[in-house]
Amino acid sequence: MAANRDYYDVLGVSRDASDAEISKAYRKLAKKYHPDLNHEAGAEEKYKEVNEAYEVLHDPQKRQQYDQFGQAGMNGQGGFGGQYGGQGFGGADFGDFGDIFSSFFGGARQQVDPTAPQRGADLDYTMTIDFMDAIKGKTSEISYSRSTTCEVCKGSGAEKGTHPITCDKCGGSGMMTITQRSVLGMIQRQTTCDKCTGSGVIIQHPCHNCHGKGVKTQKQTLQVKVPAGIDNGQQIRLAGQGEAGKNGGPYGDLYIVFRVRPSKDFTRRGQTIYTTVPISFAQATLGDEINVKTVYGDTKLKIPAGTQPNQKFTLKEKGVPSLRGGSTGDQVTTVEIVIPKSINEAQRKALLEFVKASGGSIAPQEKGFFERLKEKLS
C-alpha cells in the first residue's frame, strides 16, 4: 500500500469502529473505486488499497496485531520480514509476534467465542435491466444460490435427538495455547484447535441432511422490485436474503447491483434525459411545432423562428423520477439543423431569391467537366 497509509484512514473509520461500520465503509468505497465502475486514473490502485485495509480490519486476529504493531505486524510472521521471519534466529518459531509481547507484559488476546451466534455473510447479485425499466421501475424475478439453515438439525450440525459436545482438547474455546522456547525465553502462542478445527464443539453424530455442516446450499427465487429512477451501478439491499448465520445467528443481506442497458434514443445523466432531434433549415428559420420522443411518450415542442444550430430546449418533468420521491428531472432536447445534400431547381431558385432579398450574394459555382463538355457538343 502506498506510503503505508493507516488502514483506518483508508476506510475512513475511527480506530474503535465496529465490524458493521468497517464493512459498511468498505462496501461503499469498493463500489466507488471498482475498476468496472470507475475508469479514472488511480481508481484501480485505490480499490486494491481499500481491499487490503478491509482484509486486515475485518479479521479480529489481524486487526489486533495491526493495532499493536501497525504495518510491521503485517509483514511475514509476527512482523519479522526477510530472513528473520518464521524460523529465523536459529530455528526459533516466533509464530504470532503479538503473543510474544503478551507473554512478557501479561497481555491476553481477546478471544471470540466460537459457539456464539454469528451473522451470515452478505451476497452480491448483478441484475441487468433495460433503460426504460430503470426509469419507470418494474418487478422482476431472480434466482441465486445461498446457504440456508438445515431444517433437520436447525443449524446444530448434529443428528436429530443428539447435540454437539464441548471439545475436550480446547475446552470449547476453539484455540490452543502452545509454549515454546525461543532466544527471548519461553513464549506462548495460540493456534486453532486441531481436534474441533476452531468450532469449540465436537459433533459425534453428524446430521444426515447437512452432513454436520448445519447449513445446506439451496436455490432461492425472489421477486425484486426495481425502484423507478435507479441508475447504472446503484444497488439495493434485501435484508436477510444472504447466507445463513452460524449458531443461531441472523442471515446476511443480499445486495443487488444494477446494470442498465443503454438506449438508442436517450442519454441519461443523473435525473436529466438528453435527446437530439433533426429539423430542416426552413423549420429553424420560420419556426414550427414538432413531435419529440420522451421516456413517457411523444410530446409537442414549439420551435421558434430563428432557432440556431444545436440550440437546447428543456421539457420540464420529462426526465427521471427521484429515488427518494419528490421532483422528477427534465429532458433537454438539442435541435440539429439538417442541410440537404441536394436540391431541385425550384428550391435552388427560391434560395437564391432569399439570398438576394437578404442583401447578399452567392458566387456562381464552377461548372464541372462533363457540363462544360456537354455545352461544347451542343
From Swiss-Prot:
Location (main, coarse): cytoplasm
UniProt keyword Hydrolase present: no
SUPFAM superfamilies documented for this protein: Chaperone J-domain, DnaJ/Hsp40 cysteine-rich domain, HSP40/DnaJ peptide-binding domain
Keywords associated with the record: Chaperone, Cytoplasm, DNA replication, Metal-binding, Repeat, Stress response, Zinc, Zinc-finger
Statement: the UniProt record of this protein carries the keyword Plastid: no
Gene Ontology terms for molecular function: ATP binding; heat shock protein binding; unfolded protein binding; zinc ion binding
Manner of cofactor binding, per the entry note: Binds 2 Zn(2+) ions per monomer.
Record-linked SMART domains: DnaJ (SM00271)
CXXCXGXG motif repeats: 150-157, 167-174, 193-200, 207-214
UniProt domain J: residue ranges: 6-70
Cell compartment(s), UniProt: Cytoplasm
Coiled coil: none
Binding site residues for Zn(2+) 2: C167, C170, C193, C196
HAMAP family for this protein: DnaJ
Function of the molecule: Participates actively in the response to hyperosmotic and heat shock by preventing the aggregation of stress-denatured proteins and by disaggregating proteins, also in an autonomous, DnaK-independent fashion. Unfolded proteins bind initially to DnaJ; upon interaction with the DnaJ-bound protein, DnaK hydrolyzes its bound ATP, resulting in the formation of a stable complex. GrpE releases ADP from DnaK; ATP binding to DnaK triggers the release of the substrate protein, thus completing the reaction cycle.
Domain notes: The J domain is necessary and sufficient to stimulate DnaK ATPase activity. Zinc center 1 plays an important role in the autonomous, DnaK-independent chaperone activity of DnaJ. Zinc center 2 is essential for interaction with DnaK and for DnaJ activity.
Similarity section: Belongs to the DnaJ family.
Protein's UniProt name: Chaperone protein DnaJ
Gene: dnaJ
